Amino acid sequence: MIYFHDIDPIALSLGPIKVHWYGIMYLLGFTAAWLLGRKRIAAGRLPGVDANGFSDLLFYAMLGVVLGGRIGYMLFYALGDFLHNPLLLFKVWDGGMSFHGGLLGVLGACWWWSRKHKLHFFDTMDFMAPLVPLGLGFGRIGNFIGAELWGKYTDGTWGVVFPSGLPAPLNQLDHATLQAQFATGALNQFARHPSQLYEAFLEGLVMFVVLWAVSAKPRHRYLVGGLFALMYGLFRFAVEFVRMPDNGVYVAFDWLTRGQILSLPLIAFGLVLLVMSRRAPVLQPQLPVTAGGKA
């Protein structure tokens, strides 16, 4: 049954302060990552690091997501606007975050943190990889609630009519008028793939279940990080076929998107890590030692 999107993106208004669902989804993602990360620390999945050390790591990773995501968006998707007005970088309230930029930010933060704590960088990445899909899944749900990053038109019964995705002059009509037209079936031809939910399922739920299961037992170094890069790259590349291209423009061949191009290096990187993992040492959990000297 085709659905008419009428969810208010603002969850709560306190005078001039508006709390958006997208921000709440980010908070839920980070909270879930913090709780499950502490559980993994207690199980000895990152030897030499306690709960406080992990909290520091997650804090720097959060900074990496925000800074890298914003800078990446401006460089990958809005370079012309950024060069014309560099101050746009700081207008985060206008939206615009890039996963690939956020990933680079997280990698940079984890590299710095690992070097500071004298840990192998990829041990840190293998530890963090199962936690990232939590943020991805909640973030994509936030995209759906905010009616952004919608997909292409579909005649499937699971399609969604996004008022902001309607062509002119329909997108100028008030909400009540659009709902009345939707009730007659007049807007069914404008139903779109809920690509945000596809990504929430694949990049969020599926990746979390797989990576959590693999990382829950002794495994070779590079394996979990390699699976993360490969799976995300493949899932993102596939979903891009039913997702509207960023800025409505294809990069090449009238089908290749910028998101797909940015995913290709991830796929290659993931394959390289998986090959490297075959000769890498097997990582065994080491339970933290208590004050009494017993694990």
Swiss-Prot record:
It is found in: Cell inner membrane. Pathway: Protein modification; lipoprotein biosynthesis (diacylglyceryl transfer). Keywords: Cell inner membrane, Cell membrane, Membrane, Transferase, Transmembrane, Transmembrane helix. GO terms for molecular function: phosphatidylglycerol-prolipoprotein diacylglyceryl transferase activity. A 1,2-diacyl-sn-glycero-3-phospho-(1'-sn-glycerol) binds at R140. It comes from the Bacteria. Its EC number is 2.5.1.145. GO terms for cellular component: plasma membrane. It is a multi-pass membrane protein. The chain crosses the membrane at residues 17-37, 57-77, 92-112, 127-147, 196-216, 222-242, 255-275. It is an enzyme of class 2 (transferase). Belongs to the Lgt family. HAMAP family: Lgt. Catalyzes the transfer of the diacylglyceryl group from phosphatidylglycerol to the sulfhydryl group of the N-terminal cysteine of a prolipoprotein, the first step in the formation of mature lipoproteins. This is Phosphatidylglycerol--prolipoprotein diacylglyceryl transferase. It comes from Stenotrophomonas maltophilia (strain K279a). The lineage of its organism: Bacteria, Pseudomonadati, Pseudomonadota, Gammaproteobacteria, Lysobacterales.
